[in-house]
Amino acid sequence: MIITQMWHFYVTRVVLLLLISILPGTTSQGESRRQEPGDFVKQDIGGLSPKHAPDIPDDSTDNITIFTRILDRLLDGYDNRLRPGLGDAVTEVKTDIYVTSFGPVSDTDMEYTIDVFFRQTWHDERLKFDGPMKILPLNNLLASKIWTPDTFFHNGKKSVAHNMTTPNKLLRLVDNGTLLYTMRLTIHAECPMHLEDFPMDVHACPLKFGSYAYTKAEVIYSWTLGKNKSVEVAQDGSRLNQYDLLGHVVGTEIIRSSTGEYVVMTTHFHLKRKIGYFVIQTYLPCIMTVILSQVSFWLNRESVPARTVFGVTTVLTMTTLSISARNSLPKVAYATAMDWFIAVCYAFVFSALIEFATVNYFTKRSWAWEGKKVPEALEMKKKTPAAPTKKNTTFNIVGTTYPINLAKDTEFSTISKSAAAPSASSTPTAIASPKATYVQDSPAETKTYNSVSKVDKISRIIFPVLFAIFNLVYWATYVNRESAIKGMIRKQ
C-alpha cells in the first residue's frame, strides 16, 4: 500500500513537470533574469539600435594619434643643447621684422621704443617627419624642448616678451625640418644722437641683433626676403610727436671681440625732427624780443626811463628763453643750432642796451645854447650898453615884469623852441622896456628839444639789416642741409 502511494506521487510530479515545460511564455532558467534599465540604453541610442547607429569619424583622432607618435619619435633622443649640424655645417638663421609701432623717442635718455614681430627661420635635420600634413603648427611650449637661436639685441636696454593672455609666440614645423619661430617683443633701444643741428637735426636710430654665444663659424644670420623687404613698418605704426620717420636702411656687420667674430644684423631708422614746436616756443619769441629791443632807437634820447626799461626787460627775456630752451635737451658739452641763434639774438638785445648807454653818455641832456658856451653868452650880455637910469634888474615880456636870474643861466636853463618863436614875432614894445636891457638870440641859436642822436639814426638802419641778414643765412644753411640729408636717405 505504501509502495503504491509513493509510485503515484512520483508519477504525478513527473506529469506536472512535463506540463510546465510545454506551456507558452515560459523561459529557461538562464533567460529568466529580468532586463536592467542599462541594457535598454545600450541597445537604444537615439531611438536606434546599435546596429543602425551612424559611424563617428575618427580622422581627427587618427591625426592626433599619428602626430603624437611623430613628435614622441622626434623628441626621443633629441638633445636641445646641441645646435643643428654641429660639427658638419654652419647653422643659418634667416630673420625678418615687422614693426607694429615705432616710438616714442626720448631726447634726454637718447633711447627709443619699438614694438615688433620678430621672426626667425632655420633648418634642423633631426626634426624631419613624414605625415599627412606638410606644415605642423605647434604649441609654444615645444620651443623649450628643441634648439632655438640665442638671439639678443646688442643696443637693447630693455626687451619685453608679451605673455598676455598666453605667451605671444608661434612655432611651425615643416616636414623637411624647417622651423619658423615668431614672437612679439617690445624693445627699448639706445639711439646715439648728435645735437649740433638741433632742432633741425636728423638721427639714425639703430636696431642691432645677433647670436650671443655662437661665432660666425657656427651660426650666421641673413635676411629672409633680402635687404629691401625684410624689415617692414606698418603704415599707422608711427607713435612720434616730434619726429618724422623718413625710412630705414638694412645691413649686416661683423664685430670682433676677444671670444671671436660674430654676425650682427642692423637696421637704422632715420628720424627727422619736427621744427614747428620750437618755432612757436623759442624762435618767434626770440625774434620778437630783438625787434622790441630795437624800438628804443625810435624814442628820443632824453627818455631815459623808457629806453632803460626796454633794454633791461629784453635782456632778461632772452635769458629766460635761453634757459627754458635747454630743459628738453640732454646736458651736452657743445652748442646746438638753437644755442647759436639764441646767442646772436642775445647779442643784438644787449647791443641795443649798450647803444642807448653810449648815446646817453655823449649827449648833453640840457637846454644849452647850440654852438656857444654859457660863459660866452654872459660876456655878450655884459658888453651890451645899458641905460643911464637907475639899474633895474627886471625885464618885461608881454606887459609882465620878470626878474633876471643869472643863477639859472649857469645851470643851463633856456627857453624852448616853442617859446622862442612867439617872442621873436612880438612887437618891440612888448619885448623890452626902456628901463631894462634884454639880450635875445635868434631862433637858430636856441637848442632844440627832442633832438635825435646820429648814433640812433644809424642804429635804426644797421641793427634791422644785420638781423635780417643773419636770419637769411641761418635758415638757408639748415634748410639746404636738411634737403641733402633727405636725398641721401632716399638713395640708400
From Swiss-Prot:
UniProt-listed Pfam families: Neur_chan_LBD, Neur_chan_memb
NCBIfam families for the chain: LIC
InterPro entries the record matches: GABAA/Glycine_rcpt, GABAAa_rcpt, GABBAa3_rcpt, Gabra-1-6_TM, Neur_chan_lig-bd, Neur_chan_lig-bd_sf, Neur_channel, Neuro-gated_channel_TM_sf
The keyword GTP-binding is assigned to this record: no
Domain notes: GABAARs subunits share a common topological structure: a peptide sequence made up of a long extracellular N-terminal, four transmembrane domains, intracellular or cytoplasmic domain located between the third and the fourth transmembrane domains.
Record's GO cellular component terms: chloride channel complex; GABA-ergic synapse; postsynaptic specialization membrane
Record's compositionally biased regions (Basic and acidic residues): 31-42
Signal peptide positions on this chain: 1-28
Bilayer-spanning residue ranges: 275-295, 306-325, 337-357, 458-478
Residue(s) carrying Phosphothreonine: 427
Protein family membership: Belongs to the ligand-gated ion channel (TC 1.A.9) family. Gamma-aminobutyric acid receptor (TC 1.A.9.5) subfamily. GABRA3 sub-subfamily.
Glycosylation (residues): 63, 163, 176, 228
Cytoplasmic side: 296-305, 358-457
Name of protein: Gamma-aminobutyric acid receptor subunit alpha-3
Gene Ontology MF: a single term: transmitter-gated monoatomic ion channel activity involved in regulation of postsynaptic membrane potential
Keywords on record: Cell membrane, Chloride, Chloride channel, Disulfide bond, Glycoprotein, Ion channel, Ion transport, Ligand-gated ion channel, Membrane, Phosphoprotein, Postsynaptic cell membrane, Receptor, Signal, Synapse, Transmembrane, Transmembrane helix, Transport
